[in-house]
């Protein structure tokens, strides 16, 4: 491999909009995210299960079947 052409991989701190901070490895100096595992609905258990239905359900609803 060639020397001095690869970016420096270092430990950085990730800042979430909810206020949570954690460390990870990256070539960037700082990372800011809007959603992390502490505030995402899937990981917190607050997700909503929305079922829209398919084409058949829309057809039946439209024509009163």
Curated annotation (Swiss-Prot):
One of its GO terms (molecular function) is rRNA binding. GO terms for biological process: translation. InterPro entries: Ribosomal_bL28/bL31-like_sf, Ribosomal_bL31, Ribosomal_bL31_A, Ribosomal_bL31_sf. Binds 1 zinc ion per subunit. One of its GO terms (cellular component) is ribonucleoprotein complex. Keywords: Metal-binding, Ribonucleoprotein, Ribosomal protein, RNA-binding, rRNA-binding, Zinc. Transmembrane segments: none annotated. Zn(2+) binds at residues 16, 18, 36, 39. Its cofactor is Zn(2+). Part of the 50S ribosomal subunit. Belongs to the bacterial ribosomal protein bL31 family. Type A subfamily. Binds the 23S rRNA. This is Large ribosomal subunit protein bL31. It comes from Alkaliphilus oremlandii (strain OhILAs).
């Amino acid at each position: 491999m060639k020397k001095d052409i690869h970016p420096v991989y270092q430990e950085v701190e990730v800042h979430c909009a909810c206020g949570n901070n954690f460390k990870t490895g990256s070539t960037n100096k700082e990372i800011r995210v809007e959603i992390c595992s502490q505030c995402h609905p899937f990981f917190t258990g607050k997700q909503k299960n929305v079922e829209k239905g398919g084409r058949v359900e829309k057809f039946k609803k439209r024509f009163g079947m």
